[in-house]
């Protein structure tokens, strides 16, 4: 929460481009030339590969990075089990999947020394982390920066801040994420979260499946939606235990459980690296929104930022979708999102402002769940207003909402099903939608 941390965050340099083969060194000469693993790595460093995909996956989908570090990752004592807190992992078999429409207020304020890991609270998910399928929806509310270091062997983490800035110290370098940004931490990458404000709150999609990638654009063409160049990767920065002595607690999430070990050095000691299995930060306001300039509301797939493909083409394990500022100009068109029943399951969150399909009740930091084939759509107030509105060009710029959309039903954790901040009577927003049918004869 110090001014120095914010100054550091706001002055960071980045590398540009999602999926690029990046290279960075914090000390000149730390990267070897012409090979990955020389007999003696430069500057007395250790060469180590971090693989995010199998060696033999197609080159277009292969993810790996080479790290040149002060000590190898293997130099640590045994891990021991620790408590999982409010973190839960698929398979979610402690509850029956619920077809009801559900909505939550923001998480309650936690205690004064709650860091990012302790502040993670699992709402639900699907699949099986041990089979590398499915996803989980988490929320977080933290009041303290992390002293320890965290990594997730179960999946990659898409962090969506809603309140409070974050300085993410990763093995690859530093990332700055504010509300309106997202940060993507690949599977297995170690990191520490430092708060830039009094507290921090937001959402996390834990993706157990194939790594997130940019969606295909099809007839849209070569440009549009989330442009690859707007994803920013860190430049190399390292911690050296000679300047930061003392043990470091490392927390590893593995097959749904948290394990801890006490290192005698910081694992964030990578002096140089190259590869494409790297963390990113992305400003959602740079999303190039595609929409109709004639009539009708297009399907929400046009708002896809990132997708985790499944074994069925076009059917995602999970999509990350953003409803960014945009113009609505459709003629003779009901402009809010239409009434819908969907084979996919949708968890929605709100980063700021209001969502154009809900007049009230859907608040920043809260969320809603519409499982597969659960009917949903605009509430009565929104329907009445949009049905009678003058159809002049309308700018939607007072809200930033997002969606985690997944092919499987989202099963709630018991803590989410019984939460005090679960809103009662969410179904009431669709009550009072009157009969308007008048037969011609």
Curated annotation (Swiss-Prot):
Keyword Metal-binding: yes
A GO MF label: iron ion binding
Binding site for Fe cation: 340, 346, 376
Known EC number: 1.13.11.5
Active-site residues annotated for this sequence: 297
Required cofactor names: Fe cation
Recorded metabolic or biological pathway in which this protein acts: Amino-acid degradation; L-phenylalanine degradation; acetoacetate and fumarate from L-phenylalanine: step 4/6
Pfam families from the UniProt entry: HgmA_C (PF04209), HgmA_N (PF20510)
InterPro entries for the chain: HgmA_C, HgmA_N, Homogentis_dOase, Homogentis_dOase_bac, RmlC-like_jellyroll, RmlC_Cupin_sf
Disulfides per UniProt: none
Source species, domain of life: Bacteria
Catalytic activity: homogentisate + O2 = 4-maleylacetoacetate + H(+)
Top EC category: oxidoreductase
Protein residues bound to homogentisate: 355, 376
Entry keyword set: Dioxygenase, Iron, Metal-binding, Oxidoreductase, Phenylalanine catabolism, Tyrosine catabolism
Protein's GO biological process: L-phenylalanine catabolic process; tyrosine catabolic process
Family the entry assigns: Belongs to the homogentisate dioxygenase family.
Subunit structure: Hexamer; dimer of trimers.
PANTHER family: HOMOGENTISATE 1,2-DIOXYGENASE
Function, as annotated: Involved in the catabolism of homogentisate (2,5-dihydroxyphenylacetate or 2,5-OH-PhAc), a central intermediate in the degradation of phenylalanine and tyrosine. Catalyzes the oxidative ring cleavage of the aromatic ring of homogentisate to yield maleylacetoacetate.
Protein name: Homogentisate 1,2-dioxygenase
Organism: Streptomyces coelicolor (strain ATCC BAA-471 / A3(2) / M145)
């Amino acid at each position: 929460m110090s001014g120095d941390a914010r100054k550091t965050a706001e002055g960071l340099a980045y590398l540009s481009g999602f999926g690029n083969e990046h290279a960075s060194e914090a000390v000149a000469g730390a990267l070897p030339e012409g090979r990955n693993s020389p007999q003696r790595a430069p500057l007395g460093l250790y060469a180590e590969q971090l693989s995010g995909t199998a060696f033999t996956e197609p080159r277009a989908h292969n993810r790996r990075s080479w790290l040149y570090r002060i000590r190898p990752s293997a130099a640590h004592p045994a891990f021991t089990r620790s408590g999982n807190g409010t973190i839960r992992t698929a398979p979610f078999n402690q509850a029956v999947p619920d077809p009801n429409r559900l909505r939550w207020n923001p998480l309650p304020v936690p205690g004064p020394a709650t860091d990012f890991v302790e502040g993670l609270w699992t709402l639900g998910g699907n699949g099986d982390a041990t089979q590398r399928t499915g996803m989980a929806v988490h929320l977080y509310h933290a009041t303290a920066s992390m002293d320890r270091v965290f990594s997730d062997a179960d999946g990659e983490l898409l962090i969506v801040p809603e309140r409070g800035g974050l300085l993410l110290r990763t093995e690859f370098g530093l990332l700055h994420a504010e509300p309106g940004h997202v940060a993507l931490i690949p599977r297995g990458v170690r990191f520490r979260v430092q708060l830039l404000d009094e507290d921090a709150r937001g959402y996390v999609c834990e993706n157990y499946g194939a790594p997130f990638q940019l969606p295909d654009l099809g007839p849209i063409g070569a440009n549009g939606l989330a442009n690859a160049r707007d994803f920013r990767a860190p430049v190399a920065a390292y911690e050296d235990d000679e300047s930061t002595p003392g043990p470091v607690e490392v927390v590893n999430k593995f097959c749904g459980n948290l394990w801890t070990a006490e290192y005698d050095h910081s694992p964030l000691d990578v002096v140089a690296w190259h590869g494409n299995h790297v963390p990113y930060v992305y400003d959602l306001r740079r999303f190039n929104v595609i929409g109709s300039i004639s009539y009708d509301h297009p399907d929400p797939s046009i708002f896809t930022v990132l997708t985790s493909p499944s074994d069925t083409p076009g059917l995602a394990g999970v999509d990350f979708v953003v409803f960014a500022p945009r113009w609505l100009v459709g003629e003779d068109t009901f402009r809010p999102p239409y009434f819908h029943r969907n084979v996919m399951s949708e968890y929605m969150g709100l980063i700021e402002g209001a969502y154009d399909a809900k007049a009230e009740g859907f608040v920043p930091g809260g969320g809603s769940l519409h499982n597969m084939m659960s009917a949903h759509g605009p509430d009565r107030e929104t329907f009445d207003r949009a049905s009678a509105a003058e159809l002049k060009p309308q700018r939607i710029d007072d809200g930033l909402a997002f969606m985690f959309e997944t092919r499987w039903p989202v099963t709630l954790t018991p803590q989410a099903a019984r939460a005090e901040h679960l809103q009662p009577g969410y179904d009431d927003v669709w009550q009072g939608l009157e009969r308007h049918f008048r037969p011609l004869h």
